[in-house]
């Protein structure tokens, strides 16, 4: 049967499994279903569902290989009573999650469901708790959990295992929501608004990371797992990257090159200066873009991604110069999205790289009512105590609290034309001198240059620009990528307790 326009054709659980996993690698974990006493009517429904689908429940579970990597899989079968979850289906799902956790396997989930199985009532409804608890333990063990939402996914399934992924993607055109349209109309006497409960709309609002057709699932999952599951193998992947060329700059190199503070500020504002997107395209591998807070917010001023530099895995938080403008400056949602990235790094014990490049956070009623100041505070709080290794880079403009929110890392790097200040120099000049005409003088006095920050012990290392990243974008991005690979390898090799103690000591004694 053909699918409606824009929607992927429906695949049953075995067909989707076989499309994603390496041929011949599937091993089922399913045990025979054991049910308590049920009504004759329900027993007949179960028998018909089993006959129609050749499955004994709405969940299949097992393991296989994805591009050679061993993974655990749980998938829904919509043909079995609309994929609804009752006690037996939940038990199979929970047992599979627990086994994946015990065996240290990444878990791939492919929900498709109308929700809770109404024939089993409240006891089925409460299975959401047990499922969620099992997934929470899996994530607490530092193991990846990837979710592919299929058409349709509703109710208790979306409100439990469908919404807990480290990475969440969905079928094109999939209907996804909490309350189904038919139930809504029956309860409220009017149709549910169109085009709300769609995969594309959820992606637009930062609730899922991407819309991905069936044939691309394996590639996206493989790239994600190359990063998410790499903490235990990083030492094999970074061999040869620990010592980049001397011309890339080192901690000990005095970065003074005679640029004035105003020259640096001006260079950082060039329209053609490479930003986070150019850096990822040029110097990173296994990049998987993520999107939004997962809670209904998305800010184009912040880019969240998984990536590797020189083989070292990391979560990337980059302030995107192309996504910020006078009409759409960096807002509180961007910082909430940044905090999602911090949580991801923490859960998976991955390094976090922050790339700072902002003309400043939003100054508006919406930003104030959206809690901008509080989000800056929470970013600072989370970064300072984050157990994951952290690396900050002043890539360009570093204006105000929006920049500061991503600074307090284990190691801080700066591009030669990167800078950091409490306000734009023009703003500082207006406060002190009641005119913007002395902005260059204020920039010099405030010590905003990468060179000044290095001398003050705020920046550990300055990455050269020859003479300006905008004039050598590819070469600069490759240079910075090599440095990031070296720095990440160094951070991954340090003892966590010592590293965090050193970080806290560093920021306690800044300026002394």
What are these regions (language model features)?
Residues 154-161, 177-178:
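Glycine-rich anion-binding loops of enzyme active sites
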Residues 176-179, 184-187, 421-424, 428-430:
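Nucleotide-binding motor/catalytic cores of P-loop/tubulin-like NTPases across gene-expression machines
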Residues 1-146, 152, 164-167, 171, ...:
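Terminal-region recognition feature
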């Amino acid at each position: 049967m053909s699918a409606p326009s824009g929607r992927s054709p429906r695949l049953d659980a075995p067909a989707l499994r076989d499309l994603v996993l390496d041929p011949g690698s599937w091993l089922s974990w399913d045990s025979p279903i054991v049910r308590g006493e049920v009504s004759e009517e329900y027993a007949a429904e179960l028998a018909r569902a089993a006959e129609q689908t050749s499955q004994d429940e709405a969940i299949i579970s097992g393991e296989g290989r994805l591009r050679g990597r061993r993974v655990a899989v749980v998938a829904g079968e919509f043909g079995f009573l609309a994929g609804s979850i009752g006690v037996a289906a939940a038990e199979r799902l929970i047992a599979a999650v627990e086994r994946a956790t015990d065996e240290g396997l990444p878990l791939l989930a492919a929900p498709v469901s109308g929700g809770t199985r109404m024939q089993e009532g409240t006891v089925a409804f409460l299975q959401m708790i047990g499922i969620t608890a099992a997934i929470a333990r899996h994530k607490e063990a530092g193991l990846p959990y990837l979710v592919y939402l299929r058409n349709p996914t509703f109710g208790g399934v979306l409100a439990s295992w469908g919404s807990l992924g480290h990475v969440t993607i969905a079928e094109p055109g999939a209907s996804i929501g909490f309350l189904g349209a038919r139930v809504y109309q029956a309860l409220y006497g009017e149709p549910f608004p169109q085009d709300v409960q769609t995969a594309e709309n959820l992606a637009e609002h930062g609730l899922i990371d991407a819309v991905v057709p069936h044939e691309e699932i394996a590639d996206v999952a493989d790239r994600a797992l190359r990063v998410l599951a790499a903490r235990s193998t990083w030492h094999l992947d970074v061999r040869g990257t620990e010592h980049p060329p001397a011309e890339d700059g080192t901690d000990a190199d005095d970065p003074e090159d005679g640029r004035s503070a105003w020259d640096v500020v001006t260079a950082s504002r060039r329209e053609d200066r490479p930003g986070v997107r150019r850096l990822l395209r040029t110097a990173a591998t296994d990049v998987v873009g993520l999107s939004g807070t997962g809670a209904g917010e998305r800010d184009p001023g912040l880019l969240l991604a998984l990536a590797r530099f020189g083989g070292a895995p990391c979560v990337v938080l980059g302030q995107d110069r192309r996504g910020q403008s006078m009409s759409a400056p960096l807002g509180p949602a961007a910082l909430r999205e940044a905090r999602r990235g911090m949580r991801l790094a923490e859960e998976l014990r991955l390094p976090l790289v922050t790339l700072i490049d902002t003309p400043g956070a939003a100054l508006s009623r919406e930003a104030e009512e959206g809690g901008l100041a509080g989000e800056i505070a929470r970013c600072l709080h989370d970064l300072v105590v984050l157990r994951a290794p952290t690396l900050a880079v002043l890539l360009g403009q570093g204006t105000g609290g929006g920049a500061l929110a991503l600074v307090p890392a284990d190691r801080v790097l700066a591009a030669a034309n990167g800078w950091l200040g409490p306000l734009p120099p023009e703003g500082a000049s207006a406060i002190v001198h009641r005119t913007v005409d002395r902005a260059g003088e204020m920039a010099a006095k405030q010590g905003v240059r990468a060179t000044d920050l290095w001398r003050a012990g705020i920046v550990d290392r300055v990455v050269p620009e020859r003479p300006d990243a905008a004039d050598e974008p590819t070469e600069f991005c490759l240079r910075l990528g090599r440095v990031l690979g070296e720095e990440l390898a160094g951070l991954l090799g340090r003892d966590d307790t010592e590293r965090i103690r050193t970080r806290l000591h560093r920021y306690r004694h800044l300026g002394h």
